[in-house]
């Protein structure tokens, strides 16, 4: 895995290896990550990355948030409660020397502490476990999400926009669906 574009283009991320079977780590492939950022930065949604705060829920390796930093995001908060994920995220932040621009929270994504509003949220829960919607609701209830926030939700199937959100786009990449939402 590597950073696709921006100031850290080509930087190799810490290898996941065999990891921990119980950690449910399923890193977003380089191809899907590149396609997601092409859609986000393609002009239809303005520029939801440059200069914004980003929330990376179920961060895993941190690749999505770090890609956003490489492309100009101001700050990323990574959320994951897994031991393996915490090690991968902190290792990748150290590799890119971006600790000053990152916060790593070890908590469940549906039990977030109060936070600063973010302009972009990556939501990448383990597939098929129905964890995405509770995490999205928690992020909104605790101040991480405000009107106009763009959410990129990665799941096994396209997601229906929950109350308080509108669907912007949905795309399939193999067995992965990315649903883009915006808070209303």
Predicted feature residues:
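Class I S-adenosyl-L-methionine-dependent methyltransferase catalytic core
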Residues: 1-184
